[in-house]
Each structure stands twice: as C-alpha cells, then as structure tokens.
C-alpha cells in the first residue's frame, strides 16, 4: 500500500512535562483542533481521551504513554496536511520509564511548563532524558490564566535551571485573568482566539501600546538568535536588518532547533483554548520530520560492524519495539517505531536479539486505547502489532534478509520493594500470571521469589508506581492481594581490592572434584557500573572451558548478596591464576571454587551497604521553613539549596535517603498545616553510615 502522507510532512512528537503542568489538557486541545475529537475532554472530569486507564481517570494523572495520530494544516490552513504522531507521557517521577522509552523513538518534543510553578525537579529529569537522545524541542508555557503566572520568569528558569538557550517566538498579552492572547514576534502582530467557538477561529490585531517596547526587545533577540545560523545571514542582517524575510527567519530558527542549539518558547492557556493552535503551527514549522533526523545506526550480529538505516521506504525494514501493552481483547500489543522500509500485516520479520522469526498478525494505529486496523506501515510510522509472541521492550525487528540490531534501551534499577501475598488460593494461581504480564509491560518493575521466606517480592521506582501496579492486578486480572510495608532496595559493594584463593577438592571414591582459582576483587572506579568479569589466565593454568563456570559461581554470590543478602554492585573480578586436575576437574568444581573465592574475598575487601538517595524539593510558606529543615536534618537529609517560591514562601532542595522518606507526606502535612508540598526523584546510591548499616545487617541475619 502506497504512502499517503510524504515523510517530510511527518512529525513524531512527545508531549512531556512535570506533573500538573497541564500536559494532558494540552494534548486534548490538540485532538480537538485537529479534528480527532469533536468534543473537548477534561482531566478534572475524567474524560480526557489520552488518560484511558481507570486509575488515570480517577487520579487525574497520566500513567502510561498513550499514542495517537492526528493531522494539521495550520491555524489559517496555510500548510499542506501534516501527519503528527503524538506520545503523551506521564509527569510523575515514578513513571519516568515511560518518558525514557518514548524519548528513544521520538523526533521532537513539546515541553510543557506551568507559568506559575515554572521548572520543577521532574522537568529537569525529562530534560536530561531529551538531552540523552539529542531530541530537538520547543517549550509551551501553559496556564497563563492562573494567579501568579509569569511567562518571562519561566523563560529565565529554562536558562538557569536547565542550561537551555531559550528563544521566545511569542509574548503573552496580559496574564492571570487578564490573559487575552499572544504576540507573534515573527509577524509582529497580536493574536486573539474566538471564545465563542472554543478557539477554532482567531484574529490578528496590532500589538498593544504597553507591549510595543518589550516586543521590540524580544524580536531583536529572536532575529539575532536566527542569524547566528550562518555568516551569510549574519552579514545580511548587519547590512540591513529589515531585509530579512519571514521565511528566512523561520528557516534559520528551524535549522538551529534541529541542531539542538536553541529552544523556541511559546505560551498560552490550554484550558482557556488559547495558544495551543499556534504551538501546533510551531511543531510543523520547527520540529523535525523523520527525514531531517540523521540515519539510525545499528550493528550486525557480530556486535562490531556498524550499519546505517535511513528514513526511506526503499531501504530494508528496521523497527524498534518500545512498549508492550496487554489488551483484554487481543492479548499483547507491541508498539514499534519504523526507522526504514515498509512492513505489512502477514509479513515475517526477524528479532535478531533472540534470533527468532515473528509474524505480524495485524497492524493497528492506536488512538489512546482505541484501535484502527491498517494494512502496512512505512518509515517514520509509529504503530502497534498484534500477534508477536516473544518480543520485549527494546528489541529490534528487521527484514530477515538484512539483519540489524539497533541500540537497546537502558532501564533504571528499582529503588523500592514490597512483599505481595494472594488473599486466596485461586488468587495465588492467577497472581503469578498477572505479575509476569505487568513485568513484561514495564521494564522498571521486577518480580522475584525470596529464596529464604518463599514470599513474592515486587520492586519499582516508588510507592505510587507499586500501588498502581497492585491496583491494576486487582482490576485487570481480578487478583486480590495483601501488600507488606515498603522496603528499600539496598545494595552491597566493597571499598578495597583483595586477592583471594578458592579451592574445591572432594575425593569420595571414584571420580573426584577439583577446582582451584585465584581471583582479584576490586571496586569499580564509579558508582552504578554493575559487575565486570575479566580473564587474565596465561599458559593454560585454568583451561578456558572452565572460565565461564567461575564467572557463574561469582554471579550467583553477586545476585544473592553476602553482607546482608542484597545484590552486590560496582565490583570487578579478575581470574589471574589457578590449577586443575586432568581427571577430577569439572565445570561444577570451578563454579564452586569461584563462589568460595569471591565470598571469602568480598568479606576481606571492607564491604559496605549502599542506599538510594533521593533529590527532594519542598515548597513551603516561609513561616514553616525552620521546622521543615529541622525535620530534614533528623531524616539524615543534606540541604543542597534554597530558592524563593513562585508565590509566597521558599523552595527547599535536599538530598535524603529513601529509607527516611516513608510517610513523609503525612509528617509534612501536619508540620505545615497542609500548606506545603514536595516532590522527589532518585539521585544516586551512597554508603549507609556504619551504625545504621549494622542494624540493617543484624535484622537481615535474624530473618535468615
């Protein structure tokens, strides 16, 4: 089936922001103005199209990345129809994984900020994720109608807190209840939207007298940012600034956005139906099409030969599976982004990571949780497949005749765990299936059975994350479960290097067992580098066929923990010597020898416990600041900054161990009479102080 929309008129964008910036409301307005919805959905009434899960409608937050497609021809129908594939992503830090995997497959992002709250901690997390994947972006400063709205203050925060290079292409006409429209700094006209038809029509007018000077200043800033794109344009501007055409300015700005040199800033009030329409125009004019993005690079099966795929229908098919979702009617839905080529329903493709062929049963275009079946998808498309049996998030799908492995996604390790227990025997049978399904959908969610207690443990990115997954288990799989208290995901590591011998010799008549190794056990130079095993055997002291067995013995100790039963991280283990017996040596003997050497060496290398440290940001009236800081100090917090709040009060930034943050919301509420709020996100792992570590180790040993 031939392509309907040329690839240059595609825009694959994300709508991303911190919680409560009005992101889903913005997306709902996009769906209304592009004709997908004929009625505006609202978050506060639970009718938002993109928040389709029951929990999302009840809580008023976005949990999963919903996908939809719409078409836009411009506010004044000035463009050919552009196809916009939108991923609406969560703002809550517990669902950062959804943002991460969306950024991996998008070409551009609209960052939504609240004109009152400004740049929040979660804004910084999302910004870092966009930086990681070099995604071009524009900013939409929303909620200009709210009390305390200040457009230019948020523009300044983009510079100071995100180290961005913001270039406003609009100014606000008024703010709070006097917000009436925007000033287009390229056309140098004011735009007002018709409230009678919910902003479908608009009119231009002259810039109000009180904003003429300010508009001139920011227009100059915009032009100077644009002409930096080339010496030729700079010379033209310097010789006569009035010579620059609107088209030249827009092309120059677009070029700098695509190079991630500037961030264009727009504004409005999605709730009041103002500004979203002009922001959509900016998406078309300034964000990249798939063909603007450099080719995607992958490797062949050998892992070293690099190959490129271009956004072209004539190249071999390649795609990345970025999300697995469970649909009650069709089973697994595999969301994928096509980077090159074409695939049709019924086609066979290769999963080169698992070396398995998969068949596309049906291909569907998703609109939130509604499906529209389509025959084929082309380079640049985002769609979902039904019928893929063994595909995980981050797997590559490609033409069997031209294998390629695209760069895999990285997922954060969980920082919090709880015990779950089925309420009845019938629930017990269903619970394993439900948890495995949820873990398949969400790579930041882990499930395992505790080897000592036999209990089922689930782990995730925060209390809300686990709470919602348990709730989904109840609603979607009809499983009732009791949930234990949250537990911190501690880790174990070492401070110093040691050399340790490990011997396993057994003679009991007949063939014996013999394994003998020397290991060097060293701490990694940086935190969160995991585990590395190196082989420095020379002269065949240990035959090479036994080396993997030694690694396996070490890995078992690493996953089980030694000090207190927590996983071991940030260690490098090198086998550098040993011996073997021609008859009695075996894989199992060397596995046990490796395990013995590592366990004994680990305890000599000054082992320590690590705990997750959270970045905490509290907004509180100034009257309560002393109490809040004193409480943070009691919780082993380190104050990292104080800022003036956007309204009246202070923002306190602190680094606090996760173990001290359980129940913090209740404590903060009582301290400040409900007038303070806080947010937190995982920052790093740090050593647990000796006195506290000993209590944790002793309690674990008693349990074991």
Curated annotation (Swiss-Prot):
Assigned keywords, A-Z: Cytoplasm, Elongation factor, GTP-binding, Nucleotide-binding, Protein biosynthesis
UniProt KW Membrane keyword: no
Biological process according to GO: ribosome disassembly
Domain named tr-type G: residues: 8-291
Residues holding GTP: 17-24, 88-92, 142-145
Entries under Pfam families matching the protein: EFG_C (PF00679), EFG_III (PF14492), EFG_IV (PF03764), GTP_EFTU (PF00009), GTP_EFTU_D2 (PF03144)
Localization: Cytoplasm
GO MF annotation terms: GTP binding; GTPase activity; guanosine tetraphosphate binding; translation elongation factor activity
Family designation: Belongs to the TRAFAC class translation factor GTPase superfamily. Classic translation factor GTPase family. EF-G/EF-2 subfamily.
Function text: Catalyzes the GTP-dependent ribosomal translocation step during translation elongation. During this step, the ribosome changes from the pre-translocational (PRE) to the post-translocational (POST) state as the newly formed A-site-bound peptidyl-tRNA and P-site-bound deacylated tRNA move to the P and E sites, respectively. Catalyzes the coordinated movement of the two tRNA molecules, the mRNA and conformational changes in the ribosome.
Protein name according to UniProt: Elongation factor G
Organism: Blochmanniella pennsylvanica (strain BPEN)
Protein's gene: fusA
